[in-house]
Amino acid sequence: MGHYVSLFITSVFIENMALAYFLGMCTFLAVSKKVSTAIGLGVAVVVVMAITVPLNNLLFQFILKDGALAWAGFPDIDLSFLGLLSYIGLIAATVQILEMFLDKFVPSLYNALGVFLPLITVNCAILGGVLFMVERDYNFGESVVYGVGAGFGWALAITALAGIREKLKYSDIPAPLRGLGITFITVGLMSLGFMSFGGMSI
């Protein structure tokens, strides 16, 4: 149990997708203007990562990995070269289902996220989470915890940035730094803050 708690805390704080690896920056910067929208997108990313990382773990372990098809009578087949294509396809299918669900049951959030909901499909934070899972050879349980933790870490970062940007609207910022300029500086300072977790031993 302690191992899973450690993995969760590590994926949220020490190896934060947005502030340690700078993954998913497109939507991270574009949808962080309002806290309500940022929370909505953050929840969507958590749900997608919690589903796609474990599903891609099963896909890798039982179909793509070298010797994975032994259960089907093909022990010598290695389909790992199809990994990237397969992972993106599974992520795209999951996002499409989530988009249809939100359109049907939560139309206000669907309209607020707008074009950025389909962009979750190509959000490199989600693909990065899947690739890290494969590279680190996580089992199914670890991939579930890692998917939830990595998604929660990204959601935490975008919500915090949105809160700061809402406060910055009322600040006297020099004209050349307004907009993305001060946002990049803010993200850099946030990432420095998260670097302090790097020395933690869990």
Swiss-Prot record:
Topology term for the membrane: Multi-pass membrane protein
Main subcellular location: membrane
Keyword Cell membrane: yes
BP GO terms, sorted: respiratory electron transport chain; sodium ion transport
Segments traversing the membrane: 5-25, 35-55, 81-101, 114-134, 144-164, 180-200
Presence of keyword Transmembrane helix: yes
Keywords recorded for this protein, A-Z: Cell inner membrane, Cell membrane, Ion transport, Membrane, NAD, Sodium, Sodium transport, Translocase, Transmembrane, Transmembrane helix, Transport, Ubiquinone
Gene Ontology molecular functions: oxidoreductase activity, acting on NAD(P)H, quinone or similar compound as acceptor
Family annotation (PANTHER family): INTEGRAL MEMBRANE PROTEIN OF SOXR-REDUCING COMPLEX, NA(+)-TRANSLOCATING NADH-QUINONE REDUCTASE SUBUNIT E
Role description: NQR complex catalyzes the reduction of ubiquinone-1 to ubiquinol by two successive reactions, coupled with the transport of Na(+) ions from the cytoplasm to the periplasm. NqrA to NqrE are probably involved in the second step, the conversion of ubisemiquinone to ubiquinol.
Similarity remark: Belongs to the NqrDE/RnfAE family.
Name this protein carries in UniProt: Na(+)-translocating NADH-quinone reductase subunit E
Lineage: Bacteria, Pseudomonadati, Pseudomonadota, Gammaproteobacteria, Moraxellales
Gene: nqrE
